[in-house]
């Protein structure tokens, strides 16, 4: 008898639309793999939704606040339901970009220096000498990211806007020039290295989730030494935060710099849309999408 899997999607964060696409793709992949699937648009009555669905396993396809910051994971722990991706602590740590980087630096992984600032103060005057990146400390998918280039007279005015709904805590981080690289990790296995060439100013929300928004080159045209280093750092980051299942680590690479690779971010619930990087790397390594989501479901766990 096949397992009954509830796929959590949608949710309440600004990344809801992306999560719906990820969830639909994962639900189809799981059905193709032979599982019974129930799709849940996760809302404020998630406890009742889970009770009604009564799944054997929960596939967490949520993105952003509430879905990948440890909160939903805590609910699933309470109900004793095995779930995919990282647990409560790793999810909460990774979602807090600055705290995650404190842990990663302690593990010897190079990350750009940054400071936490109130968004209203950061909108009035530079709190770090440009160039720097200003972004919400606890959002994903490059939502609300601003690059402040050298010579800029003022910070982004949007940070002080009344329309801003991404939290008052801003991470101001040194801008690292170079090429965009990313590595997906399946438990202790780094898949490969992809170079991302966005067709916008940087790899923003539009570039990530719009067809044609970016070009993905895999394997990345880099030396074997740098590829090995990127994959090693991605696995070390995965372990340092106590992650499980699948993660994706994003890097900047500058061959002329003393430190050629900087880890920008680790994503504990990488996108699984048709344009997403992690499933693309898995397929390059010979893992079909249905096999990938089946592996994630079979490796789901609780209280880890």
UniProtKB/Swiss-Prot annotation:
Which keywords are on file for this protein?
ATP-binding, Cell shape, Cell wall biogenesis/degradation, Cytoplasm, Ligase, Magnesium, Manganese, Metal-binding, Nucleotide-binding, Peptidoglycan synthesis
Entry EC number(s): 6.3.2.4
Does this UniProt record's set of keywords contain Manganese? yes
Cofactor note (record): Binds 2 magnesium or manganese ions per subunit.
Pathway listed for it?
Answer: Cell wall biogenesis; peptidoglycan biosynthesis
PROSITE patterns assigned: ATP_GRASP, DALA_DALA_LIGASE_1, DALA_DALA_LIGASE_2
Decide whether keyword Cytoplasm is in the record: yes
Mind listing the GO molecular function terms for this protein? ATP binding; D-alanine-D-alanine ligase activity; metal ion binding
The record's listing under Pfam families reads: Dala_Dala_lig_C, Dala_Dala_lig_N
User: Which terms does the UniProt entry file under GO BP?
Assistant: cell wall organization; peptidoglycan biosynthetic process; regulation of cell shape
The record, for InterPro entries, names: ATP-grasp, ATP_grasp_subdomain_1, D-Ala_lig_Van_CS, D_ala_D_ala, Dala_Dala_lig_C, Dala_Dala_lig_N, PreATP-grasp_dom_sf
User: Which positions does UniProt annotate for ATP binding?
Assistant: 128-182
Q: Where in the cell is it found?
A: Cytoplasm
Positions that bind Mg(2+) 1: 250, 265
* Positions of the ATP-grasp domain: 101-298
Q: Which residues bind Mg(2+) 2?
A: 265, 267
For activity, the cofactor(s) needed are: Mg(2+); Mn(2+)
An example of a Gene Ontology cellular component annotation for this protein is: cytoplasm
Q: Catalyses which reaction? A: 2 D-alanine + ATP = D-alanyl-D-alanine + ADP + phosphate + H(+)
Function noted in UniProt: Cell wall formation.
NCBIfam families from the UniProt entry: D_ala_D_alaTIGR, PRK01372.1
- HAMAP family xrefs: Dala_Dala_lig (MF_00047)
The UniProt family comment states: Belongs to the D-alanine--D-alanine ligase family.
**The protein's name in its UniProt record:** D-alanine--D-alanine ligase
List the source organism: Maricaulis maris (strain MCS10) (Caulobacter maris)
Q: What is the lineage of its organism?
A: Bacteria, Pseudomonadati, Pseudomonadota, Alphaproteobacteria, Maricaulales
